[in-house]
Amino acid sequence: MKEEELLKKRLMELCEKAYNQNIYTYTHFLNEYEQSIYQDMKQELAYAHPILVGGHKYFTRAVVMFGSEELFGYQGEVPVVCARISPVFDKFAEELSHRDYLGALMNLGIERHLIGDILIDGRYAYIFCMEHIIGVIKEQLDQVRHTRVFVEEVSWEETGYVQKYKKKEGFVASMRLDVLVSQAFSLSRNISEKLLKSQKVFHNGKMCLSGGQKIKQGDIISCLLYTSPSPRD
């Protein structure tokens, strides 16, 4: 609860600073739970025109930017950039996971809230981060696990990255949230209920504690920190 109150206070401070001083302000990267807190405050913060920015369309981690061209009369720059990590020797490159890339960044002393989404595309990875740490990543990240890598800053629009999806078909008794979570992630209703109570289920970016709400076509459901009971690497 203390962390939640601190975040609410910080959001209000950044909102007031942006509005009173006519300058753009930003949070660090927020996870989905933190974004849910922001969503609950959104109407209260609306006078400073806040928006979520993650660097790409389907973000899960994002910064809140306060301010707009309409409000200030000038366009602000979002301090979020994209780095592409590539193997130096493609022939000897390992198959690296999200955890591998994140661990390599954390080993450089980079704090988690400065890093956004990490998207993997074959032997390449795209990492969104705050602009002021891109230099550190480019200069110091030269190895992920046993694979030698090099880093370059890229424009996201020019990467050609295509979001990949896994299609799953099935029948559900109703369009309730808990039913769909169980079906989509192959979980028992009991585990789905535990995830909801543990604040790990989000519907269109808002945290859900009850599985009874109805889901519509096009809605987005996400679950955090679920580990399959079957062993896997």
Where are these regions (language model features)?
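Ferredoxin-like alpha/beta domains used as RNA- or RNAP-binding modules
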Residues: 1-179, 183-184, 207, 221, ...
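Basic (Lys/Arg-enriched) interaction patch that binds polyanionic ligands
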Residues: 174-224
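Conserved small/polar residues in nucleotide/adenosyl-binding loops
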Residues: 226-233
